[in-house]
Swiss-Prot record:
Recorded family membership: Belongs to the HutP family.
NCBIfam families recorded: PRK03065.1
SUPFAM superfamilies: Hut operon positive regulatory protein HutP
UniProt-recorded name of the protein: Hut operon positive regulatory protein
Keyword field contains Transcription: yes
Quaternary structure and interacting proteins, as annotated: Homohexamer.
Gene symbol of the encoding locus: hutP
First and last residue of the signal peptide: none
C-alpha cells in the first residue's frame, strides 16, 4: 500500500520541481527526514537527448543513482522519457516540430510503500515552458515519470 500523501514519491518530485529556490526548504527537509535522495536542475533545449543527459548527469553527480549500475540508469531513463511524454503531450519530438522547452527538473528516489520489500522507486518531474522558439510565445507544461529500480 502507498504511504500517506506526504510519502508519495511523484507528489514530492512535482513539488520539488515547482518550488522556487527560496521555497524549497520545507520539501527538502521533508525528503531528508524520509531519507530519500533527490536533486534539482534546469535544462533548455530543442533536443530530447539533451534533456535526458541533463537529468542523468544531475542524478549521478548528486548520488541519486549509481552511474555504473545498469538497472539504476535504466529506471532513471524510463522515468525521464515518461516525464517528457507528459511535457510534449505524447509526441516526443521537439526540434523537428520547431518546439523548444525550458524546464526545471527534480529527481527523487525512495521507498514510497509501507512494505519496504516493495523496494526503491525513482520519480522525475519536469516543469517549465514549451512552444515555438520565440520568447514569449510558449506556455506552461508539466510531466511526471515514475519507475521502480
Amino acid at each position: 500500500m502507498l504511504k500517506q500523501a506526504k510519502g508519495r514519491i511523484g507528489r514530492n518530485a512535482v513539488l520539488l520541481a515547482l518550488f522556487e529556490e527560496e521555497e524549497e526548504g520545507k520539501i527538502t527537509a521533508h525528503l531528508d527526514n524520509l531519507q530519500w535522495r533527490y536533486c534539482k536542475g534546469k535544462v533548455g533545449s530543442m533536443e530530447l537527448q539533451k534533456i535526458v543527459a541533463s537529468v542523468e548527469t544531475a542524478a549521478k553527480r548528486n548520488n541519486v543513482v549509481n552511474g555504473e549500475l545498469y538497472r539504476e540508469m535504466h529506471a532513471l531513463y524510463h522515468a525521464v522519457v515518461e516525464a517528457v511524454q507528459g511535457v510534449t503531450r505524447g509526441q516526443v519530438e521537439l526540434g523537428d516540430l520547431m518546439r523548444t522547452v525550458g524546464l526545471r527538473f527534480a529527481v527523487v528516489r525512495g521507498n514510497p510503500y509501507e512494505n519496504s520489500k516493495e523496494g526503491e522507486w525513482i520519480a522525475v518531474a519536469l516543469y517549465g515552458t514549451i512552444g515555438a522558439p520565440i520568447r514569449g510565445l510558449e506556455h506552461e507544461t508539466i510531466g511526471l515519470g515514475i519507475n521502480h529500480i
